[in-house]
């Protein structure tokens, strides 16, 4: 029995799925995914990220809200790849619970974004999201998106 090849999504296709653009497109590549179940993506953190100008001068740390936004975008990609939308529908970030930050994300880091579907009901899909750097958890949260 052979292992299945990873299902990679490059930035060009990501931009067809998400409306975000620079400086708020926070997923560089999807490394693999399984519709309706999980997705693994990466965000490379450059010292040139616009947020580092003020967060914090001389001590650049990726703001936690941007880590959560990166997880939400990974969630959106999985939702778009899983569920069929009717004309004019989009997926919207609907909620976040139990967000915890465990380590800083710094320039030069490669942040791995892992999202997993918990359940889908009446147009609301719940996910777990975990962002890691070098295998260490940087952030974990429960996320929700709504189809509207």
Curated annotation (Swiss-Prot):
Its EC number is 4.2.1.59. It is an enzyme of class 4 (lyase). Its main location: cytoplasm. One of its GO terms (molecular function) is (3R)-hydroxyacyl-[acyl-carrier-protein] dehydratase activity. GO terms for cellular component: cytoplasm; membrane. It catalyses: a (3R)-hydroxyacyl-[ACP] = a (2E)-enoyl-[ACP] + H2O. InterPro entries: FabA_FabZ (IPR013114), FabZ (IPR010084), HotDog_dom_sf (IPR029069). It is found in: Cytoplasm. Coiled coil: none annotated. The active site is at residue 55. One of its GO terms (biological process) is fatty acid biosynthetic process. Keywords: Cytoplasm, Lipid A biosynthesis, Lipid biosynthesis, Lipid metabolism, Lyase. Belongs to the thioester dehydratase family. FabZ subfamily. Involved in unsaturated fatty acids biosynthesis. Catalyzes the dehydration of short chain beta-hydroxyacyl-ACPs and long chain saturated and unsaturated beta-hydroxyacyl-ACPs. PANTHER family: 3-HYDROXYACYL-[ACYL-CARRIER-PROTEIN] DEHYDRATASE (PTHR30272:SF1). NCBIfam families: fabZ, PRK00006.1. This is 3-hydroxyacyl-[acyl-carrier-protein] dehydratase FabZ. The gene is fabZ.
């Amino acid at each position: 029995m052979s292992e299945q090849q990873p299902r990679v999504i490059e930035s060009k296709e990501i931009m067809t799925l998400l409306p975000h653009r620079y400086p708020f497109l926070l997923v560089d590549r999807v490394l693999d995914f399984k519709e309706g179940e999980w997705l693994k993506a990466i965000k490379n953190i450059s010292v040139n990220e616009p947020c580092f100008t003020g967060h914090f001068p001389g001590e650049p740390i990726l703001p936690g809200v941007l880590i959560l936004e990166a997880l939400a975008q990974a969630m959106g990609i999985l939702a778009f790849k899983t569920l069929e939308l009717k004309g004019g529908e989009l997926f919207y970030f609907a909620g976040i619970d139990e967000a915890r930050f465990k380590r800083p994300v710094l320039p030069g880091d490669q942040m791995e974004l892992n999202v997993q579907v918990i359940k889908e009901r009446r147009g609301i899909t719940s996910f777990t999201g975990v962002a890691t750097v070098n295998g260490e958890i940087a952030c974990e949260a429960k996320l929700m998106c709504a189809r509207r």
